[in-house]
Amino acid sequence: MTNTRKSHPLIKIVNHSFIDLPAPSNISAWWNFGSLLGMCLGLQILTGLFLAMHYTADTTTAFSSVTHICRDVNYGWLIRYMHANGASMFFIFLYFHIGRGIYYGSYTFTDTWNMGVLLLLTTMATAFMGYVLPWGQMSFWGATVITNLLSAIPYIGPTLVEWIWGGFSVDKATLTRFFAFHFILPFIITAMVMIHLLFLHETGSNNPSGMNSDSDKIPFHPYYTIKDILGALFMIITLMSLVMFSPDLLGDPDNYAPANPLNTPPHIKPEWYFLFAYAILRSIPNKLGGVLALASSILILMLFPILHLSKQRSMSFRPLSQCLMWMLVTNLLILTWIGGQPVEYPFITIGQMASMTYFFTTLILMPLTALMENKLLKW
């Protein structure tokens, strides 16, 4: 008699994905982020569901309903801050996951990679709409500034913006639709994650060496299940420390003031995880140019499989490419810092230089270095 785990139509899918899955024997802790992202998504859906039970998507009561959740609902403050800081953890893991993919050449699995980029875009849209919901000052003005960028699209721009707003400014209609989208998108993300995994399991995982690991595979369970549990523990400790000791560390104090269309905050900025893209947007003194640069800063990821000119897949044995990779990471940290600074000298110049370096490194320096390494190795 066959084991139910291997014969049951539903359980066997789980078995092939998480139990008997052949995995490379040498994947490092950098391969933990996929499961951590899955956990984050589950946590966000769960905490979000409980928040939605008490939240009202109406301009007059949205801010008060969030205050009510924090003050009057049992452990409402905990649910709210787990949701807010859970989003930050989500993006930290996303950026690590993408960085791992770039470093070890995982983008050569083009289907999996492109699905991942679409996942990133959808997650960014979800997070942006979620930030609007508490209807504080930064929620309102962030929504106004970011949606207004679409007006830079020639011909259809202004009409498109008013269509998204549901009126002539960010108002009740905007808040209601943003809540509807913010609720539905995580479920769409879950479906996309399943497709992402489907594509991944067609090829199997990459590994730090970048070489084929078919000759040395081990079962996912118990080896990597226990490893994922360890990663999960680290995540829970970090998240709960953040939630319990400094829940507002990553937030903006302006969002504790109710939205006021008649009073513009001195510095409008998004959440920290969008600051690098915001800095790129602001570094171009032209609206359409800025919007195109903003879109390119994310969509450039889709070009990585084409720009891969090295004969080796991974950067593990390519010291010059490693230097460029860490230069890119530092550059993104500088952009993140600049995105949170006021638009004045010297920040404008630093932002412009960092933005230029970002595109120059990814589009020109990295492919040229790969060719040079091939030459040095006489390949």
UniProtKB/Swiss-Prot annotation:
Role: Component of the ubiquinol-cytochrome c reductase complex (complex III or cytochrome b-c1 complex) that is part of the mitochondrial respiratory chain. The b-c1 complex mediates electron transfer from ubiquinol to cytochrome c. Contributes to the generation of a proton gradient across the mitochondrial membrane that is then used for ATP synthesis.
Any one GO biological process: mitochondrial electron transport, ubiquinol to cytochrome c
CDD domains: cytochrome_b_C, Cytochrome_b_N
Transmembrane segments: 33-53, 77-98, 113-133, 178-198, 226-246, 288-308, 320-340, 347-367
Membrane topology: Multi-pass membrane protein
GO molecular function: metal ion binding; ubiquinol-cytochrome-c reductase activity
Subunit organization: The cytochrome bc1 complex contains 11 subunits: 3 respiratory subunits (MT-CYB, CYC1 and UQCRFS1), 2 core proteins (UQCRC1 and UQCRC2) and 6 low-molecular weight proteins (UQCRH/QCR6, UQCRB/QCR7, UQCRQ/QCR8, UQCR10/QCR9, UQCR11/QCR10 and a cleavage product of UQCRFS1). This cytochrome bc1 complex then forms a dimer.
Cofactor binding remark: Binds 2 heme b groups non-covalently.
Cellular compartments per GO CC: mitochondrial inner membrane; respiratory chain complex III
Family in the record: Belongs to the cytochrome b family.
Chain residues that bind heme b b562: H83, H182
Cofactor annotation: heme b
Residues the entry annotates as binding heme b b566: H97, H196
Keywords, in A-Z order: Electron transport, Heme, Iron, Membrane, Metal-binding, Mitochondrion, Mitochondrion inner membrane, Respiratory chain, Transmembrane, Transmembrane helix, Transport, Ubiquinone
Protein name, per record: Cytochrome b
Pfam families attached to this UniProt entry: Cytochrom_B_C, Cytochrome_B
Mitochondrion is among the record's keywords: yes
Binding-site residues, a ubiquinone: H201
Subcellular location: Mitochondrion inner membrane
More info: Heme 1 (or BL or b562) is low-potential and absorbs at about 562 nm, and heme 2 (or BH or b566) is high-potential and absorbs at about 566 nm.
